[in-house]
Amino acid sequence: MKKIINIFAAAAVSGALLASGCTTYDAYTGEEKVSNTAKGAGIGAGVGAVIAYFANRDESSKERQKRMLAAAGVGAIAGGGVGYYMDSQEAKLRKQLRETGVSVVREGDKINLVMPGNITFDTNSGHVKASFYEVLNSVAVVLDEFEKTIIAVSGHTDSTGASDYNQQLSEERARSVANYLRSRGIVDARFDVIGFGEDYPIADNSSAEGRAQNRRVELTLIPIKEEA
């Protein structure tokens, strides 16, 4: 008999995965590029933050989510099929998100979608722009097809203003994206919603360009694996 394994166990090897760098795809051309920024403290910082969050959760919350996934009928991927499953999902996401401004980043067996704040939200707003709904609709189609993943939605801000305000705004934005995807039929049990405030920048906050990059919401897709 098979069962869903502890999906958070991946944190034990996260350091090795992040150290190996990641592959990203241009948000407009869809062409593959290896990003030095994505290594270490770059784009990978967001994925690393999510992995650390999962690793530090208490056992009761982990077990509760596993029960919720099972109750919702969410299946798991056989160990040998994880790579192919995530490759297929990545290919569809790249196709759907070409020319949208959303970056697709591959980190080992995880996929990270980076949604820049300027196309997702108005300034200081926690509500998704209506103009971004179509992009989220495209994401939802793929998430619905590839349901054997946890969806960690994390909000990030720049360092301008009070840290408490930035924390609240990051939480509101992450919730807003997650709630929209839920409204498109994505199973609630798959979501973890996290606000990181200004703690995990991917660019230098001393420049306007860097601050713009740091204002973002990320979706980290984590495969749900089976064990014998």
Predicted features along the sequence, with ranges:
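N-terminal Sec signal peptide cleavage junction
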Residues: S20-C22
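Short, low-complexity, glycine-enriched hydrophobic/amphipathic alpha-helices that associate
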Residues: Y25-K92
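Amphipathic, membrane-active segments
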Residues: M86-N118
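Periplasmic peptidoglycan-binding/anchoring modules of Gram-negative envelope and division proteins
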Residues: Q96, F121-G155, R182, A212-N214, ...
